[in-house]
């Protein structure tokens, strides 16, 4: 075993991912560092089995006995990553492709609200399943029906079941699916890279228990249950590491990110998510699952190599990590078609369209279609969106905002002599908190009061006095028109304007709004 760091590096972080995987993160590396570590392992009898490079990324895979070593170097960020896996199966990976008999296709399984379940039919009639969704009877039944209906064989063959990360809405379907349908399908391989079930040091949320469920859905309980089901199927299990390339039927798959790359920077389970670049049917599909682009530094590590025809929108469009990094990624990916694993309601009315990164994607000129999960949808590869669907997407965005209220509300005919005229009710029906700017106008211009701010929590109804303690009347560092500086004139008429960063419903017990406007 080599001692790492071996060449006097000042910054080296070591993490134990689970019982069989260790990862070393070396900063301020260069091309020579990559070559030196390859030579170091080769010098102690490791055999280099694979090596490739792109303009800003180098990868090498070495083996010795049952141990595998995977080395990645990213020149733009000057980071070297070394992963050592005991009992490694990567080098014995074999996939036997059958006769090409059908067109490849992707089915986004119907979702109750959100989750992730994809069935990818290969050209030989076998399937790649990504995640599967919740361990709910409808989720597993819809997945099985899709496999059964689209398979050219009487018994569907799952060439690979890929599990992206340990969250209830992604992998737990596998447990119930095996319990119900193990005898009616053949599962050849399972692919994943999960932490240990009790790794609360790195991932405290593994013990999270959701009060909405009567069953124990915590990962501490369900990761072992999932592993037991894998053994029950007899499927070969592979631990995926960044840089590895797999040929599954006629699908070429490359792992761009996994827990290897984020264990040292985030305790967020979503950050461990697999990112897989798949080439199938003459197109490139980027599966980002729930990855946070900023945690994984995907734009910096891969640049234009991220370009894809079809993008599965990360984290259901809910955003994970910084929006700015997501937007940089979308500018590099430039997808024409997006798969968004949420219902129309969550996508356009309740959540996604109000996230900065997802809103940017919805307005990107290159995006011709966003396919949500309200209905089950199958696309045959290569797939090109119809010309009219972009217009329909824009109409859904606009309708979603209208359904939530307006961005600007104006009330007139109020009087400072009436205490109740300062009391308003605000309804925020989105899943994100809203900021409201409030302005008061009087007949005398110099009395105007500006930049009163109020925060309205997500999915909530709030009644507030706009000049009371529940509103911030002096929100700016310097506000010459602040409530505190000017005060309220006595016994004069006034008007109030609400400017909302989310669509909002503003009401008053005794007055109707004089004006409300929607901006989109």
State the predicted function of each range.
Residues 28-50:
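Amphipathic alpha-helical segments
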Residues 95, 184, 189-191, 197-254, ...:
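Binuclear metal-ion centers of metallo-dependent hydrolases, dominated by the metallo-beta-lactamase
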Residues 125-128, 137-195, 301-318, 334-338:
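Active-site metal-binding motif and surrounding structural segment of the metallo-beta-lactamase
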Residues 114, 136-137, 166-172, 197-200, ...:
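Active-site environment of divalent metal-dependent phosphoester hydrolases
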Residues 396-520:
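Gly/Pro-rich, tryptophan- and cysteine-flecked surface segments typical
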Residues 1-24:
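Compositionally biased P/S/T/G-rich terminal and signal peptide-adjacent segments
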């Amino acid at each position: 075993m080599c001692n790492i760091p071996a060449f006097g590096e000042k910054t080296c972080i070591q993490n134990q991912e689970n019982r069989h995987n260790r990862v070393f993160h070396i900063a301020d590396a260069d091309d020579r560092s990559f070559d030196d570590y390859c030579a170091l392992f080769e010098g102690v009898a490791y055999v280099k089995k694979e090596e490739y490079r792109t303009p800003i990324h180098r990868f090498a895979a070495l083996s010795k006995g049952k141990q595998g070593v995977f080395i990645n170097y990213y020149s733009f960020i000057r980071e070297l990553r070394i992963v050592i896996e005991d009992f490694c199966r990567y080098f014995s990976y074999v996939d036997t492709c059958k006769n090409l008999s059908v067109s490849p296709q992707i089915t986004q399984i119907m979702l109750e609200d959100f989750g992730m379940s994809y069935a990818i039919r290969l050209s030989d009639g076998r399937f790649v399943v990504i995640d599967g969704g919740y361990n709910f009877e409808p989720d597993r039944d819809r997945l099985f029906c899709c496999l059964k209906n689209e398979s050219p064989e009487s018994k569907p063959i799952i060439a690979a079941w890929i599990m992206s990360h340990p969250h209830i809405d992604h992998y737990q379907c596998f447990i119930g699916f095996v319990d119900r349908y193990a005898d009616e399908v053949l599962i050849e391989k399972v692919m994943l890279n999960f932490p240990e079930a009790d790794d609360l040091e790195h991932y405290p949320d593994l013990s999270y228990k959701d009060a909405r469920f009567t069953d124990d859905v915590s990962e501490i309980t369900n990761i072992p249950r999932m592993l037991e089901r894998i053994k029950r199927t007899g499927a070969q299990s592979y631990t995926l590491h960044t840089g590895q390339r797999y040929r599954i039927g006629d699908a070429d798959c490359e792992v761009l990110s996994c827990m290897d790359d984020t264990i040292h920077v985030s305790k967020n389970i979503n950050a461990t998510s697999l990112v897989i670049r798949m080439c199938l049917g003459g197109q490139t599909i980027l599966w980002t699952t729930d990855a946070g682009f900023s945690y994984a530094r995907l734009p910096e590590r891969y640049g234009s190599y991220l370009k894809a025809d079809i993008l599965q929108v990360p984290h259901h469009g809910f955003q994970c990590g910084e929006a700015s990094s997501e937007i940089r990624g979308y500018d590099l990916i430039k997808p024409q078609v997006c798969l968004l694993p949420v219902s129309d309601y969550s996508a356009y009315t309740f959540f996604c369209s109000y996230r900065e990164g997802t809103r940017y994607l919805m307005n990107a000129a290159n995006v011709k279609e966003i396919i949500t999960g309200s209905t089950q949808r199958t696309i045959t590869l290569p797939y090109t969106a119809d010309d009219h669907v972009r217009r329909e997407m824009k109409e859904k965005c606009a309708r979603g905002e209208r359904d939530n209220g307006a961005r600007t509300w104006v009330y007139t005919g109020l009087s400072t002599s009436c205490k109740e005229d300062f009391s308003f009710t605000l309804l925020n029906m989105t899943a994100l908190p809203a900021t409201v700017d409030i302005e008061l106008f009087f007949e005398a211009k110099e009395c105007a009061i500006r930049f009163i701010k109020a925060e309205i929590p997500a999915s909530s109804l709030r009644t507030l006095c706009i000049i009371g303690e529940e509103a911030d009347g002096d929100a700016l560092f310097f506000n010459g028109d602040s409530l505190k500086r000017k005060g309220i004139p006595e016994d004069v008429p006034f008007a109030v304007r609400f400017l909302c960063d989310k669509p909002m419903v503003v009401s008053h017990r005794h007055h109707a709004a004089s004006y409300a406007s929607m901006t989109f």
